[in-house]
């Protein structure tokens, strides 16, 4: 047995006993092949090891079998082995160039690989660059994509809003034509131009005015027919209106009874003894005075009752709203018609002059008699009361929704 010593370690060889050389180490396994479509992995750089010093030739070594080429004898690390010297620092460009010249392809930048090699080398270089970047760039990529998607989503929303603004909508319920036919009943233009007929009728009944609150144009509303008695709806009235109605009703009943009794006492042959009695003559004077008071009460409170009747009539009539006609509007303006008077007496004058009411509706004696009496009582009111009503410019038709 002979021992050969060297600077980097010791090597054992059994020349005398005929021991064979130790078996060579198996070659390292090949790197795993990446699936198609993914970049090739970057192999790790080989660790730096200093070269072993050449050992002197000995007779045993010369007599022994020759070692095959390409095999490296195993090294035994000892205490005398020195650590590898540190690598010298090189600029980034030189390091990349040196790596490219030495055959270490994975350290090549994508630009250099694309300029130097084919598409395979550029893909490998791009894959190595992505691996060297690591997972730190993924949030940035996602944020860019998310910002692009959010910006595209915001653009779609703005486009949707602009498309909605171009569609005509009702200025009362803010719905489109799918809820009903849209009308143009007044001079308003733009986004407040159109409205549904049912929405406008409900707004007129609740607001109590035939005019538009924006352009002050009187709607062309016509009465079609009265509802059936089973479809009549009640309206809400205030306490003052209730007192006024009760006073007018009681005054009317007392006036009718008093006038009837006075006429019977004056012309009946069976009341001769009453006309001669002094007590009945005093009663005649008192009844005459009370009749005058009742007439004044009815005239004073008749307008309030008339307004309540108009409200009830507006609720229990079928109305139709006409579209705005510019030619008619110009013609009415040229004639100098007062919108206040037309608005105040619209249900009476407009319907009679244009013959828009059905012959069987509101023209029968049972409706016409009371309607004309209330109208006459309202005309007999003092002028200051009429001026107060005309100053408002609206039909008092305040009706709550039922």
Curated annotation (Swiss-Prot):
Stretch list, region Disordered: 1-161
Pathway assigned in UniProt: Protein modification; protein ubiquitination
GO cellular component: a single term: cytoplasmic vesicle membrane
SMART domains: RINGv
Transmembrane regions listed in the UniProt entry: 245-265, 278-298
Catalysed transformations (reactions): S-ubiquitinyl-[E2 ubiquitin-conjugating enzyme]-L-cysteine + [acceptor protein]-L-lysine = [E2 ubiquitin-conjugating enzyme]-L-cysteine + N(6)-ubiquitinyl-[acceptor protein]-L-lysine
E.C. no: 2.3.2.27
Motif annotated as YXXL motif, chain positions: 371-374
Positions annotated to bind Zn(2+) 1: 170, 173, 196, 199
One BP annotation, GO: protein ubiquitination
Gene3D superfamilies named among the record's database cross-references: Zinc/RING finger domain, C3HC4 (zinc finger)
Composition-biased stretches (Low complexity): 111-124
Motif PDZ-binding, residue numbers: 399-402
Residues in RING-CH-type zinc fingers: 162-222
Primary role: E3 ubiquitin-protein ligase that mediates polyubiquitination of CD4. E3 ubiquitin ligases accept ubiquitin from an E2 ubiquitin-conjugating enzyme in the form of a thioester and then directly transfer the ubiquitin to targeted substrates. May play a role in ubuquitin-dependent protein sorting in developmenting spermatids.
Domain notes: The RING-CH-type zinc finger domain is required for E3 ligase activity.
Protein name: E3 ubiquitin-protein ligase MARCHF11
Organism from which the protein derives: Homo sapiens
Encoding gene per record: MARCHF11
């Amino acid at each position: 047995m002979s021992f050969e010593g060297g600077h980097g370690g010791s090597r054992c060889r059994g020349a005398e006993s005929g021991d064979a050389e130790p078996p060579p180490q198996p070659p390292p396994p090949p790197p795993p092949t990446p699936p198609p479509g993914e970049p090739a992995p970057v192999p790790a750089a080989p660790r730096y090891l200093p070269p072993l010093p050449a050992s002197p030739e000995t007779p045993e070594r010369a007599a022994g079998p020759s070692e095959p080429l390409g095999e490296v004898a195993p090294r035994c690390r000892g205490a005398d082995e020195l650590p590898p010297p540190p690598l010298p620092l090189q600029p980034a460009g030189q390091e990349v160039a040196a790596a490219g010249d030495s055959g270490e392809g994975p350290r090549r930048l994508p630009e250099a690989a694309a300029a130097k090699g084919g598409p395979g080398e550029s893909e490998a270089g791009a894959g190595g660059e992505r691996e060297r970047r690591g997972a730190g760039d993924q949030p940035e990529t996602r944020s860019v994509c998310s910002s692009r998607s959010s910006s595209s989503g915001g653009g779609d929303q703005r486009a949707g809003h602009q498309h909605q603004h171009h569609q005509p909508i009702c200025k009362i319920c803010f719905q489109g034509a799918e809820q009903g036919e849209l009308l143009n009943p007044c001079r308003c233009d733009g986004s407040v131009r159109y409205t549904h007929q049912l929405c406008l009728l409900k707004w007129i009944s609740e607001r109590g005015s035939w005019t538009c609150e924006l352009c002050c144009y009187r709607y062309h509303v016509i009465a079609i027919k009265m509802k059936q008695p089973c479809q009549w709806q009640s309206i809400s009235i205030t306490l003052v209106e209730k007192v006024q109605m009760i006073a007018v009703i009681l005054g009317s009943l007392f006036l009718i009874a008093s006038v009837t009794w006075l006429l019977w006492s004056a012309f009946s042959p069976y009341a001769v003894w009453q006309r001669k009695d002094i007590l009945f003559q005093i009663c005649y004077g008192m009844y005459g005075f009370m009749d005058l008071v009742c007439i004044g009460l009815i005239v004073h409170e008749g307008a309030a009752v008339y307004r309540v009747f108009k409200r009830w009539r507006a609720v229990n009539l079928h109305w139709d709203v006409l579209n705005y006609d510019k030619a008619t509007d110009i013609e009415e303006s040229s004639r100098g018609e007062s919108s206040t008077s037309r608005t105040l007496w619209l249900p009476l004058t407009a319907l009679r002059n244009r013959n828009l009411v059905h012959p069987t509706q509101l023209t029968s004696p049972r409706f016409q008699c009371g309607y004309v009496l209330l109208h006459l009582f309202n005309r007999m009111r003092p002028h200051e009361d009429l001026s107060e009503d005309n100053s408002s410019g609206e039909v008092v038709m305040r009706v709550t929704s039922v």
